[in-house]
């Protein structure tokens, strides 16, 4: 009964039959149907085997065509319904055990964009894709006198302007109410905690976060969060990894609580140097590496130079450069520059002009700045002076810049489950209504 038969299977790679009747290699060209052709040869010892193979190939081909056309058999439809019922039962069981909303479908929960609020620095908002994210952990680190506290105080002032509550955990015991007031902080309503140790600082911040009544908590700084065991011990005692373990344990609790409450946690951090590093960057932030993982946004701030007075004999400020080293809510590795004037804070007018130039709202040709058909001045200082003398024009330019930011970067943010179940259309109306709050 030996006969040389030419048999080949042309098979779609997404559906491969697992059967001993098909010991053949598929052809290089695929087709939804199975058929005999002269691509490969195989010796078969029984015509019954050939008949069975042909019959099974037609059956598989018809089933595959049904799958492509979306036609499900009653048995398959029944299995699908049973799986959906089992899924709903499991979700209901989890919600009854751990509380409503513990597990849900993203679409039914009202998927929304990442909610942000202004950092108070327009160029930084542009680099962040709209601002600082709500309900997330943010780390700001850099060398001494680089503007870390100033940046945090501007964020606190913006939250208070929008009617929110802010808290400052002053672990360094160096809070300056006069300087904070000059930056726009409502010091009368600012919640301040000057803790005795790191455990007290983080526990206080966690309790305020869980209350749901605080919108922003700033810890200044991680390096000053001294564990209780280190305070009670003698100076010079070796306490290995106490602060790192403290931060790791606290962040495991606080990150989830902050997300549920919609409270942003800002941690200011200092830079240390690793010993024995000859190649690469020896700089490292204090408090272990847990904060690097839990932070949704990490900002590195450094001084880019001093600002001299008009006579050139006195330093009146510094130019800060911020680099977005990590961001889970926008594109990372962007940079922002702004001027920090001593005793006054960030130059908001300079930020408006810089952003307007970047987004081509204001056009610079040569040394001249112009807005639409109106010339603002020759040189940066003249343009700033013109905007300073025309507040209405300044507000108009800033409003256009923020509208472009809302239409661009913010709408490309990562979706998540919002704590408030507002629809996308309602959010767009709120964004338009809240433009005046940015002023």
Curated annotation (Swiss-Prot):
Organism name: Arabidopsis thaliana
Name under which the protein is recorded: DNA repair protein recA homolog 1, chloroplastic
Gene that specifies this protein: RECA
Keyword Cell membrane: no
UniProt keywords, alphabetically: ATP-binding, Chloroplast, DNA damage, DNA recombination, DNA-binding, Nucleotide-binding, Plastid, Transit peptide
Biased amino acid composition, Acidic residues: 429-439
Residues where ATP binds: 142-149
Superkingdom per UniProt: Eukaryota
GO CC annotation terms, alphabetical: chloroplast stroma
Biological role: Involved in recombination ability and DNA strand transfer activity.
Span list, region Disordered: 413-439
